[in-house]
A protein has these predicted regions:
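C-terminal "cap" of GNAT-fold acetyltransferases
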Residues: 117, 121-128, 134, 140-170
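Acetyl-CoA-dependent GNAT
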Residues: 13-19, 24-93, 104-106, 110, ...
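Short amphipathic alpha-helical segments
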Residues: 7-10, 83-86, 152
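Short glycine-aromatic motifs
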Residues: 62, 135-136
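Conserved N-terminal entry element of GNAT/NAT acetyltransferase domains
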Residues: 1-20, 162-170
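Glycine-rich phosphate-binding loop
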Residues: 98
Length: 170
């Protein structure tokens, strides 16, 4: 994969052929971006649980958007049931370059346009600040068992303003 920084990312819907590249992107993101918050064993269990059998089908069942640079995926977000941000990953080389913000803003606009009134997410420790900056509030802390490991995450929510009420990202 080339360095994604020289070009602005494009945005497109998930295609079934994306599953392999997005699985690799997940693994790289977990390994490099979550190292400060999760042990190596926790990262491995987390990664294995995400890219298990059915990963492509899971993405296809959701509204999944893919950010690309020069045709290569650099991030993706999956919105389930027009309400829950199910999966959201950015490649480490694209982190901090606005890819995550672009993906999130697009999915929030789509959810609102489709009548969504609330977004929820179970957010990893390293992504909590990203969601707080976008108006999400923490509801509860969770401990999730994955294989022989436990992972901590936080359930967060954000009410969406109606499209005709001047809604938008704060």
């Amino acid at each position: 994969m080339t360095d994604p920084s020289p070009s602005l990312p494009g945005l497109r819907p998930f295609l079934p052929d994306d599953a392999g590249a997005l699985a690799e992107l997940c693994l790289a993101s977990i390994e490099e971006l979550a190292a400060e918050d999760y042990s190596e064993a926790q990262q491995e269990a987390w990664a294995e649980s995400i890219v298990a059998d059915g990963f492509g089908e899971r993405l296809a069942r959701s509204l999944t958007l893919v950010a690309t640079v020069e045709g290569a995926p650099v991030g993706f977000i999956a919105l389930r049931d027009n309400r829950h941000v199910d999966l959201f990953f950015v490649h480490p080389r694209a982190a901090g370059q606005g890819v995550g913000a672009m993906l999130y803003d697009a999915v929030e606009r789509l959810a609102r346009a489709r009548g969504g009134v609330l977004l929820t997410v179970d957010v990893s420790d390293n992504a909590r600040g990203f969601f707080e900056r976008r108006g999400f509030t923490a509801l509860r802390r969770n401990t999730v068992t994955v294989g022989d490991e436990w992972l901590g995450n936080t359930t967060m929510e954000k009410p969406l303003a109606a499209p005709d009420a001047g809604g938008g990202s704060p």
